[in-house]
């Protein structure tokens, strides 16, 4: 006996968007039938004197084509007085005051005579009769549109061919005392359907492997692989692959290394350095893409909260070494990421580093809550002594750079995030008071940038929600374990990294997406379209199976 849960669809229904049949429908049945046991048991409660007393019930949903193969079983709890029972399929709208198989688009296998009924009141000899204790299975193959039955685990052969789409499992009873239980995969099946599924999976995969391709397919695939390596900045691998396949790399190696450097900065959470490096290597890129710059800046704010952005990490380092912290020093932080001028403009206080207490954290929350409330208003007036034309006075190109224009050697600020050992959890901005103050100043600058974008380019719901979600992190004493804490997950950096990488490639007239990824996406979309069109073979064609 096979025992996978929800067996009829669990292994082949990966493309199905529609729910599969899981029980009988209390709203799609004849009144002569009663349901119980989670709508899986059906009992007859009519008079049962003539064929006009027959009654059927359909499942809650039709069988989705995307499942490929669907199987269910019905156990005869009691054959009742005469055992006039039918098990089969029907489309929506078929008369339920009849046994399955008697009407058009209705198909059934009957227990009293063992005949199969295909849209007709006249049956054809098919299999043995069935009675109390027997288990009858019905398998619908949506690849070749056939149906076969099983009895007590043994196949009885094909019963119906050329089946229409959107069929519902159906059972019908006609005489008093008849009771049956359905199994739509909630329990182990008597018949080993897995072997049948494996057989058809092998057939479909063999068809795919035998599909003819053009003679240049190998060189085409090599070019796609090469472009994929170049796109993601795998410089050494791309160079080695190009040599081994006698190709030329589409992009200069220096350019690939530059993109790789920027990607590493983004994926490590060092957003300030990533923005600075991008502006140095591609001076006009972010100026021409203000929404991209805004996205990068919002991510930088999130990394400040996380304590991973270079700016706050450097402040944390310096404040541990100096009682005045970075804010009071005359020097800038590494790579010019934080400038003394910006501090003088926005942050006038000097604070020693300390773990944040509850009072301080509440103050931060109130400050940023005020920022959120201001942002929600359409008539926000920024403080003129802090901003010029809606932006920080430290900016040079209309948008805040978050960095100095100098280019000193990169100074690594790789200290681990501070942990509040008294509470056993992470601290805002690594626990540095100076870093928290800089984060608040940066948040104000970010809000100013948002207002400027809205004035110049109109409302942007994506930008507004992005900023609101980022600011919402400060509404919680432990943002990592808050409803918006997902933003602090390193995996959230990947989308930002991809957007920036695509923009850089675009200025080099290279594809924003690698052809290999587009081909895989096209294959996935084709499979989904096959499922929508009722082509059952799509159930056995997974793109992932060919990526190993």
From Swiss-Prot:
Primary location recorded for the protein, binned into one broad class: cytoplasm
Family matches, as InterPro entries: B30.2/SPRY, B30.2/SPRY_sf, ConA-like_dom_sf, CRA_dom, CTLH/CRA, CTLH_C, LisH, SPRY_dom
KW Cytoplasm (keyword) present: yes
A Gene Ontology cellular-component term: plasma membrane
Keywords for this protein: Cell membrane, Cytoplasm, Membrane, Nucleus
UniProt-annotated stretches for the region Disordered: 1-23
Domain CTLH: 255-312
Cysteines joined through disulfide linkages: none
CDD domains, sorted: SPRY_RanBP9_10 (cd12909)
Domain B30.2/SPRY intervals: 2-189
Topological category with respect to the lipid bilayer: Peripheral membrane protein
Compartment list: Cytoplasm; Cell membrane; Nucleus
GO biological process: cytoskeleton organization
Domain LisH: from-to ranges: 217-249
Record function comment: May act as scaffolding protein, and as adapter protein to couple membrane receptors to intracellular signaling pathways. Acts as a mediator of cell spreading and actin cytoskeleton rearrangement. Core component of the CTLH E3 ubiquitin-protein ligase complex that mediates ubiquitination and subsequent proteasomal degradation of target proteins.
Family label: Belongs to the RANBP9/10 family.
PANTHER family: RAN BINDING PROTEIN 9-RELATED
Assembly and binders: Identified in the CTLH complex that contains at least MAEA, RMND5A (or alternatively its paralog RMND5B), GID8, WDR26, and RANBP9 and/or RANBP10.
The protein, known as: Ran-binding protein 9
